[in-house]
């Protein structure tokens, strides 16, 4: 018997709602509809996310988005079987909005609820694409707050092979963009500008590139960009595109080479890239070329699903339920986990 799952995402500065139908057996759940509201315009004036404003905007948006998804799918709210929501990690106030709405809906409808790990949502989001991956695979999870390489044997079976010891790749993009005065959100702005510059104009470090392990470090690169920007002084405006291109090339080279090293270490022949930085064109181009040479398949989420969204939360819930690894409940006294490592939900071998 199939299940209709409503997913709500509110961990940071996007409000997302989606409906997924999960069938019996191993069939990939089907996305029926999703709606998303980004708060970028609201936070631009502040140069970054203001948590209190983010929480208030989630309150305004989540129910209208739910109605939009129901209209688009042709489904009725009372036919929803499970209400899933992002339990963490993320901004505490923002998480509480999504959790509160999900549990209120569950209580009103007498339907069970399920808290989902935000990073697992990203990790499983490529299953929403027209070319879903198969287990096992190496996953590169790369976003503003996280950079990790994992061996993924199945839903809930994650082995962390390496992770950042300081800044995440997305943070390196954003902070470097801020140093160049590119505004918010910095990462996409830096990547657009990089298309006009030379990736070899400046010699920037590739931290831990030859460390022999699969960990990452981007703090030193960020410092090098700051030093270079100060050295340029008045020339920065004229050389900004070159500095952006050189910065992007340094970050991407590390991500690609570490991913290839993870493939070599595990012997796997499939890569999944997930998280907001997975939308970066240069990363996709370089990783595609490297994987083609290595005869390895690479999978990404659809571009519009690289950002935070409700579809990935509904999908993660559906896949957990299908695998019989987690059961929804009617305990509506919810809690959230602003800090929640992915290995905390990994099943024992």
UniProtKB/Swiss-Prot annotation:
One of its GO terms (biological process) is tRNA threonylcarbamoyladenosine modification. One of its GO terms (cellular component) is cytoplasm. Its EC number is 2.3.1.234. It catalyses: L-threonylcarbamoyladenylate + adenosine(37) in tRNA = N(6)-L-threonylcarbamoyladenosine(37) in tRNA + AMP + H(+). It is found in: Cytoplasm. SUPFAM superfamilies: Actin-like ATPase domain (SSF53067). InterPro entries: ATPase_NBD, Gcp-like_dom, KAE1/TsaD, Peptidase_M22_CS, TsaD. Its main location: cytoplasm. The keyword Membrane does not apply. Pfam families: TsaD. Its cofactor is Fe(2+). Fe cation binds at residues 118, 122, 308. Substrate binds at residues 141-145, 174, 187, 280. Belongs to the KAE1 / TsaD family. This is tRNA N6-adenosine threonylcarbamoyltransferase. It comes from Acidovorax sp. (strain JS42).
